């Protein structure tokens, strides 16, 4: 019986000529006459056992593919050009892909030009980018490859500080490609992370490129009232979907987002004041009642900073209170601060450089009702007076932007809305052009290079150019509206000495 001789790494395999002749695959068609010669056909780059498996498939249409042998069989099937086995191997690899092997499969797919495996491994890397940074192969990704991965719209990062940590870990292995840092968008980063990068001697150039990472864009949480029951909905920029998180039956409450949880603070239920605080995780939708505040109150002012929820002032029955207290996320004990100099409710509070600024609102007792314009600052564990606002305002909305405070006032006793800028370093107020007039609730938040205002429509105010954009939006029955980014960077005063500790803490929090 005639046979064809193959030599693989010095080992000989004799194959019946009839098997070669009957094979529909091009490789064997090309060598059908080669068996007449005495010399063996040398096969390079193929595993001996993998070639045996291919011969079994050609003969019996059966092949044993496992996660342990799939790569060597796939290589052989590509070289010998056996498409059905290639497909089986690729399906096996895709089925078994995970965060620990996706970079290796990504590199394998590039080496052999396997598009389906490339797409699947890329998808796995994108979905598990923080986990794959622990893979030794991560540092071997090229600059262009990592740029492509981190520029994907669905890359699984929830904050630009996380992107920064991924880049810093890669740069540690690739110090000649530090300019990859320029894919960052500084306006989405915390001041702490920007300072850390500066201390490392890295400079992020100003970019006009569009933001492609959906995960670093702002999430939105909205509470809308309907027949005394308010529905909480959450919008995720990664999924581009709105989901219902739950309901609340409170009125006159305040709310704030901290560590991906929505806190609902104080208010009234069935016309009775409450001092409880509820918390709902916006991802898991699980509710938890946290420790009660020190007293029953509504119309409090709230703000968050460094993982803490601050509750300031409020209305205790008919009397304004000066109580200020905070609760650290994940703990159960409220910590009291010194009382405000002037008790108030319905004012605004905002953090600037770890100092609390409180402004406006109403001071009331059983005999008095005073609309305030005064401003207090909590710094160095005490409240001090600052320059008052230009006018008295009972309803105030405030936001920090670029180290200063921007204030929009509501309408009660006033005839129109006002927009002010408080220059913190100069302790000085200036009045700015106000684009619209609106009677009713408003919601104000800082969004990178603009300030978002939800009133009778959606407005964007750009402080640097003092310009406005208007967008149609149904705002009926909205009780609360906020935009936020997920994951919070450990807050500290980063110095050359504390930098290694800070980066280590960030790596533990973000990349493990």
From Swiss-Prot:
Pfam short name (any one): BTB
Kelch repeat spans: 216-261, 262-307, 309-354, 356-403, 405-449, 452-498
Superkingdom, natural source: Viruses
Keywords attached to this entry: Early protein, Kelch repeat, Repeat
UniProt keyword Cytoplasm present: no
Keyword Repeat: yes
Family per similarity comment: Belongs to the poxviruses Kelch family.
Protein's recorded name: Kelch repeat protein C2
